[in-house]
Structures are given as structure tokens and as C-alpha cells.
């Protein structure tokens, strides 16, 4: 690779010319390939995998930037359902290279088990198309045990739980932030040194959790085997992404996990995940500059769902909520827990847009609303009868908000066969246009079913 400019091209300013720019060679304004980012705009489970699957058919590179196997995507291709937790769902496309970035935390047994399960369904050649950053942190089995212990302790001391997936994600990110975590490069380096660090890490956790037992020798033996299986896939992630950005033209896609309202900084804290699920996480989790971010697509259901506990202003604890749960098959891919359901909340979507700067929205599962007589949309929050102009950081306050709704007549007809905008009932079109105008972001896709063919492209 050749560069068009370097520090040697600077001229000395010992005797500056009258025109400071005279004779100076400036760096070329060439930012390289742009990256398209797909992000959840609610509490997860919005259908990001479907949008990624749609875009991945034309993508050269599909990347994960944060989270771990706590995420869950279901993708339907030619009638087959593929479940992804850690692998980028773009791995289905035989022409795509998939990247697991440094911001992802990797449970190696889970990674290989997931790949093998999808192999049985028809996934081929994944190991030759997967790149893993050497800077990614490792999730160990004891991290998962600690995750469960912490949840039990929260229940005992506070009477409430976070609703963690118990996949060890939080403890692993805690190890990372405490600078005691272990990375892929450690595993593939001097194994004797890795073993010492691993034992020290186990001892630190055992000093905090007396009930934690770990068979270190057995674990190390397995980790060494997993490391050798992983070795051919590992690259310097920063250099790999730089080459991809500044080499020949490429379509690069970043597949966000979780969602805006689960972001460690901007979500409904503390009922959040442990990583940045917003657009900044794409930069820090892959080592790419903000200048290379191109399109940012937000994904939202035509209603709202949430797994686990935490404030949910538009939740419907009634027959409507049950109908949405049943018709939408709202069960978590990772946890198997039923999702809580409610009306679409535009306060949340506007908030997610403030943080992410969406260039377009995918509105999924419109067909689930087909049977409703009337449909409501949350427009604003009120406290003591007064509108508040922001999304509250204080969860106690969020629990107390009163939602101001706009009510629409239902279209009472089947939209699942629609493949073009004009195939949708007028009342459904009105609903979509209303949502679009009040978020201030164009809706690019409307989903009316499980498969990629059920995504109506608007422009």
C-alpha cells in the first residue's frame, strides 16, 4: 500500500514564506471506503439480522463491533431459520468476509457450538470467511458462573435483578475495564504466560466469590485446543480494517448488537448491557475513524418490546400486550424469555436518533398489527401533567411518566403478502408516514414477515 503524503512532505517554517501555504504539499482528502452501520433503535430484537441479511447479499465485509453471545439474531433464508449470537449474520452470504472486532467479547465454546449448529442447517465454509481481532477479550466459563452469582446476590440484597442473559458478558467487560482481562492475542501467544494470567484471574474472582469453583487445568486444556482452532482466523483487527477501508472499493457493513436503550451509557441504566450499542461503538469496537461512517440505519419494530425488567412507558399489561406477544412470537432468541410488549414509542426513537444520527429507518413486523381495531403511538411523556422535552436518565422518573398517545384506526387486513408500497392498505401507509414525519428520519424498509423477501424497500 502506498501513501500520498507523509511528514517528510512538510516544509520547514524556520523562514516562513509570506504565503504560508506556498510550496506545501497537503494530505489528500481521501477518507477511503464508507461503512454502513445497522443499529437497534429500541430495546433489541427489532429485526436487525433481517436488515443485515438484506444488505449482506451485496457486502464484501460484515462486521460485529460489540457485545457477545448475549445478542440474538434469527435470519430466514430459503425457508431455513439460522440463529446467530456471536457470528455476524452476514456469514450466510458465501461471498462475504465476516469480522469479529476488538469490541466483541468471545466465548470460544459458544462460538464453535453456534457455527456447528448452523452448519447442520446448511451454513458452509464459515471458518474460511471469519476474521477475529487479536484484541478481542475472552469470555471464560467462570465469567458465566459469576454472572449468575451476581444476579442471585442482587436478588437477595436489593430484591431485584438486572435480567442478565448469564452469558458472562458483564463480568468480562468488567475484567476488561479493570485491566485484568485476557485477549485473543494472549491465548495465541506464550501459553505458559497465558496460563499464569488465567490462574491469577481465577484467583481474583474466587477471592470475591467464595462459592466459585474452577477446574483450572481442565479449562486451560480446552482453551489451548480452542486457541489452535481459532488461530487461522485471527488477524490484527486494526490493520485489517484499515486495509479494507483504504484498499480497493468495498461495501463494508457493521452489524450492531443489542440496541440504543440497552447502551451502557445511553440506555435505561442499570437495566442495560455492558457495551456501547450506539454508533460510537462501531468506531471503538473495530478501530475505524468516524470519517468512514456512511449510512446509519436504525431498526425499529412497528410496536415496542423489551426482555427483562426495567421501565417501559408504553407497555400494555392487557389483552393488547398479550396479542402482540402471541402474534409476534415474542420470545428472546438467547434467553427463551417472553418479551414484554407495548405500543410504538416515538420518544424512544427520537432519542435514539439524537445519539446515532440515523440516515434511514427500517420499520419491521408491521404485519403483527394487522388484526387490531385501533393502534396507538406514544408521542410524548408528561410528568405532573407537563410535557418533558427529553428522555429521562432517572429510571424512577421514567417509571412515573404519563404517555401522550395518538390513536389510529387499524387497517384490519393482511399485509404479509405485500411486496411493494402500493400493496399496503391506505391506513397502514398513513401509519408509516406519520411515524416517519414525527421521527424526522425517512423509512427505507417496511417489514411484513420473517424472510428477506418480506422487506418492502421504499427508496
UniProtKB/Swiss-Prot annotation:
Q: Which cofactors are required for activity?
A: Mg(2+)
Q: Which residues form the active site?
A: 45, 73
User: Can you tell me which residues bind substrate?
Assistant: 45, 333-339
Is Cell division found in the keyword set? no
List, alphabetically, the HAMAP family matched: Adenylosucc_synth (MF_00011), Adenylosucc_synth_vert_basic (MF_03126)
Give the protein family: Belongs to the adenylosuccinate synthetase family.
Q: What's the protein here called?
A: Adenylosuccinate synthetase isozyme 1 C
NCBIfam families xrefs: PRK01117.1, purA
Amino acid at each position: 500500500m502506498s501513501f500520498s503524503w507523509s511528514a517528510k512532505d512538510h516544509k520547514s517554517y524556520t523562514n516562513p514564506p509570506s504565503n504560508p501555504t506556498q510550496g506545501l504539499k497537503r494530505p489528500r482528502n481521501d477518507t477511503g471506503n464508507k461503512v454502513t452501520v445497522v443499529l437497534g433503535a429500541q430495546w433489541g430484537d427489532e429485526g436487525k439480522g433481517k436488515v443485515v441479511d438484506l444488505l449482506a447479499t451485496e457486502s464484501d465485509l460484515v462486521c460485529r463491533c460489540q457485545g457477545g453471545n448475549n445478542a440474538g439474531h434469527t435470519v430466514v433464508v430459503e425457508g431455513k431459520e439460522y440463529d446467530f449470537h456471536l457470528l455476524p449474520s452476514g456469514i450466510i452470504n458465501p461471498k462475504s468476509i465476516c469480522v469479529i472486532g476488538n469490541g466483541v467479547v468471545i466465548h470460544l465454546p459458544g462460538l464453535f457450538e453456534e457455527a456447528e449448529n448452523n452448519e447442520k442447517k446448511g451454513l458452509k465454509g464459515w471458518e474460511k470467511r471469519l476474521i477475529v481481532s487479536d484484541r478481542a477479550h475472552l469470555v471464560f466459563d467462570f465469567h458465566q458462573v459469576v454472572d449468575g452469582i451476581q444476579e442471585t446476590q442482587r436478588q437477595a440484597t436489593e430484591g431485584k435483578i438486572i435480567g442478565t442473559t448469564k452469558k458472562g458478558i458483564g463480568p468480562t467487560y468488567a475484567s476488561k475495564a479493570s485491566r485484568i482481562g485476557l485477549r485473543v492475542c494472549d491465548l495465541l501467544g506464550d501459553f505458559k504466560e497465558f496460563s499464569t494470567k488465567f490462574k491469577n484471574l481465577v484467583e481474583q474472582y474466587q477471592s470475591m466469590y467464595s462459592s466459585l469453583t474452577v477446574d483450572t487445568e481442565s479449562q486451560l486444556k480446552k482453551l489451548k485446543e480452542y486457541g489452535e482452532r481459532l488461530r487461522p482466523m485471527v488477524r490484527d483487527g486494526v490493520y485489517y480494517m484499515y486495509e479494507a477501508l483504504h484498499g480497493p472499493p468495498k461495501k463494508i457493513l457493521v452489524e450492531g448488537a443489542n440496541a440504543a436503550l440497552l447502551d451502557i451509557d445511553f440506555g435505561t441504566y442499570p437495566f442495560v448491557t455492558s457495551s456501547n450499542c450506539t454508533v460510537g461503538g462501531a468506531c471503538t469496537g473495530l478501530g475505524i475513524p468516524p470519517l468512514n461512517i456512511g449510512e446509519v440505519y436504525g431498526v425499529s419494530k412497528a410496536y415496542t418490546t423489551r426482555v427483562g425488567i426495567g421501565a417501559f412507558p408504553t407497555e400494555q399489561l392487557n389483552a393488547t400486550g398479550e396479542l402482540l406477544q402471541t402474534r409476534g412470537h415474542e420470545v428472546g432468541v438467547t434467553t427463551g424469555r417472553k418479551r414484554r410488549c407495548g405500543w410504538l414509542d416515538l420518544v424512544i426513537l427520537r432519542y435514539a436518533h439524537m445519539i446515532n444520527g440515523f440516515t434511514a429507518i427500517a420499520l419491521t413486523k408491521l404485519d403483527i398489527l394487522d388484526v387490531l381495531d385501533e393502534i396507538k403511538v406514544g408521542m410524548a411523556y408528561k410528568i405532573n401533567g407537563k410535557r418533558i422535552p427529553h428522555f429521562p436518565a432517572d429510571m424512577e422518573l421514567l417509571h412515573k411518566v404519563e404517555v401522550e398517545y395518538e390513536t389510529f384506526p387499524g387497517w384490519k387486513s393482511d399485509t404479509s403478502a405485500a411486496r411493494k408500497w402500493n400493496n399496503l392498505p391506505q391506513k397502514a401507509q398513513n401509519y408509516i408516514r406519520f411515524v416517519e414525519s414525527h421521527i424526522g428520519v425517512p423509512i427505507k424498509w417496511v417489514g411484513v414477515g420473517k424472510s428477506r423477501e418480506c422487506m418492502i424497500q421504499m427508496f
